[in-house]
Amino acid sequence: MAESVITSYFPSQIASDQEKQSLEYGTTVGRAIEREWFNNDNGNSRFKSNQVSFHNLRLYARGEQSIQKYKDELSINGDLSYLNLDWKPVPIIPKFVDIVVNGISDRQFDIKAYSQDPYGVNKRTKYMESLIRDMQTKELNEFAEAEFGVNLFENNPETLPKNKEELDVHMQLSYKQQVELAEEQALNVLLDGNKYDLIKRRCNYDITTIGIGAVKNTFTKAEGAKVEYVDPVNLVWSYTDSPYFDDIYYVGEVKSVHLNELKKEFPWLTNDDLKEIAGQSVSNSGFYNRTINNNDEDDSNTVQVLYFNYKTFTNEVYKVKETATGASKIIPKTDEFNPPEEMYEEYGISKLSQSLEVLYEGVKIVGGKTLKWELAKNMIRPKSDYTKTKMNYSIVAPRMYKGRIESIVSR
């Protein structure tokens, strides 16, 4: 019986950390992504197929789809001279798309922050207990103030709740600590600065029309946390059955970048490097169908750049040595550290290690050289499991099945 052979163009995941950090490893990853998405051996690449499919769906959603198929059905041997029809498409789908997008884009919530630390909880509890005391001794306090001029109220008697229900509402709506107000304000400023509502509406429109939406999360010291809209037409990702893309091991996007912007991003590029990159872009323009996004002719000063994340793992290794005083000294080591068994007993040496998921960031000219490959400086890790990490791209395709994406417009 013949054995099945699975061909993979990606480098080994069990390579050493030193090998994974090399530029050659990143170049191999970039070429493997190109092999999966931009390979034209069968006459049509996966990337170009997505471009054409998403472009046609967006035309349908705008009521601007091609009418040639309608003419072919009504014509007789290609003759339309006897027909006097208005061939402009009836904009039926756009109305329903707007209804769906507007319905799911309505923001029906406000940001509310509640302190959960012991100090904040204790402060809230003391305030609530003071309100209860004032409610229980209200008549006595009013009598003391009227007869003796002594104010025994701990809070303003005019805003004092009358019963337990009003007390619960007051604690939920009226009471706010300064740290909670500051947190709410910070989150609102963050959302407003990133144009959250506009990006959310664009993602909702993409999910409705083409069945997939995406954003990119980044962090810089100058701008802080940033959320950027990503056009799904330019996305590449590893195969997944999950509509939330939470099990992919690589993801990226193709951007059309002008040479002057590329020079600012990578100052070490020389004029010869830029000429070589521009030549690679023109010779490999078949990878990327510009006519969908740009009606102009190919510009040799604009290149297609692949920005991608690659998920793998690293081994945190420590050497534990027992000192003369009986204490333990922990020394960081590379993943190649593997002392023989004799040293464990003779010198009191032991080894500690754990595996962590990590992200590598890469930048590659499509069909050309690799410009960047390094361990990501900022990684998103869930608090529940520090060993896990998340991609910088957040993608969702609610009606995806077996890798096939479906949308309301496509149905």
Language-model features, listed with the residues they occupy:
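Extended, helix-rich architectural segments
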Residues: 1-392
